[in-house]
Every structure is written in C-alpha cells, then in structure tokens.
UniProtKB/Swiss-Prot annotation:
This is SsrA-binding protein. The keyword GTP-binding does not apply. Belongs to the SmpB family. It holds the Pfam family SmpB. Signal peptide: none annotated. GO terms for molecular function: RNA binding.
Length: 156
C-alpha cells in the first residue's frame, strides 16, 4: 500500500496553501483509548497543528481531537501533545533538514491503515504571499481551460 493510502479521517488543506511540500513521511501516532474512538468518529481538526523534534523524538502539537461523547471522567485532553513514531534514521535526517531556515514539519493527513492510525507529515518550506497569489492564478487558469474544453466537447 502506498504512503497516505487508507481511510482518510482528516486532511490539513491549509498546509498545501501555506507550504511547498518537498518530502512526505508516514508516521504512527501514540494515542489513548478515547482518542482513537473519537478519531474513528471523524472528530479531528488539524488546521493549526505542527510537528516538532524534541530530545530526538517527534511530537505533534495543536492537533485537536474532540473528547469522546461516551467517555467518562477519564477522557483525554483535546490539545495534548502526541508522540509520532518514526525510524531513528528518518528522525536524524529530519533533524538536519529542519535546522535549515524556513523548513518545518507539517501534518498533511490522518488516516487508518490496517486498523492503525497514521499521520502523513510533510517537510515544507513556507510560501510567501506572492507565491500564494501565483498558485491561485494558476488554479483559476486551469479551471477556465477545463471549462472551455468541457463546453467544446458538448458541441458549442
């Protein structure tokens, strides 16, 4: 199964708008019992989340997993820091890459693969405002071309 495949539960659409994604890595995530139940229900927000390397381990910050509705007083903290599981070689490579100016680790999607929750993180370089404008112009032009092609196929 290729990276990023499986049942997608949440996507960080803002990441592709704000960053040039250069590489992606599939990571496992350490969760508590009520967290996985809430994730399976699709109650996850990855909008402002980011990954950070601390003490040689990768952690995911600001990913909001809503408390499980049927949970009791032992429910989890929605914004707690969660550990990501990666191979040591990959972590060492990321340490070197993220020390460069402008690079950061951004979670792209959360999905289930063989019953396990996985997070696809990307090594991204921040976009400037004019880069974002160029992307929007490119998307609009592509949309116009497709619309014209579709109209031509219909027989106009």
């Amino acid at each position: 199964m290729p990276k990023g495949s499986g049942k997608v539960l949440s996507q960080n659409k803002k990441a592709n708008h704000d960053y040039f994604i250069e590489e992606t890595y599939e990571t496992g995530i350490v969760l508590q019992g009520t967290e996985i139940k809430s994730i399976r229900a699709g109650r996850v927000n990855m909008k402002d989340s980011f990954a950070k390397i601390e003490r040689g381990e990768v952690f995911l910050h600001n990913m909001h997993i809503s408390p499980y509705e049927q949970g009791n007083r032992y429910n989890h903290d929605p914004l707690r820091t969660r550990k990501l599981l990666m191979h040591r070689k990959e972590i060492n490579k990321l340490i070197g890459l993220t020390k460069e100016k402008g690079y950061s680790l951004v979670p792209l999607k959360l999905y289930l693969k063989n019953g396990f929750a996985k997070v696809l993180i990307g090594l991204g370089k921040g976009k400037k405002t004019y880069d974002k404008r160029e992307d929007l112009k490119r998307k609009d032009a592509k949309r116009e071309i497709e619309r014209a092609f579709r109209d031509r196929q219909k027989g106009f």
